[in-house]
Amino acid sequence: MSEKTNAAKVWLEQNGISIDQKPVIILCGSVFYFRIPRALWQDRLNKLKEAGYNCIDVYIPWNYHELVEGGWDFSGERDVEAFLQMAVEAGLWIVARPGPYICSEWDGGALPAYLHTYRGMRIRDNDPFYLK
């Protein structure tokens, strides 16, 4: 994100989690910016907060941002930075779940289609070419 923020100190304690030395119960909901029109992002985040949640988890699908090899797009509906900033402003913690592979009933697990054009590459494997 473009602004520097103070990161919270998260500790796993014997009886739970503490954040900045305070015991916390994490209530987390999944909010996927890539399935919601940008105009509704703030509304959905606010509703989650109003329902008592204090955290979101969000996938960041690789193939949503890199449609063609080397062609990254983080504008408009793909502006994940703006989405994450809205979550922070709503008072929500974030569990970011970037690819390369995601579940969430997403085509190809969010792996870019161009990967299938490379002969001999074994996808989702220890293949050095894939890992590069």
Predicted feature residues:
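N-terminal carbohydrate-binding accessory modules
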Residues: 1-55, 85, 93
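The substrate-binding groove and active-site-proximal loops of carbohydrate-active enzymes
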Residues: 26-37, 62-79, 117-132
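Aromatic-lined substrate-binding rim segments of carbohydrate-active enzymes
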Residues: 42-115
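Active-site region of glycoside hydrolase catalytic domains
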Residues: 3-7, 13, 89-92, 102-132
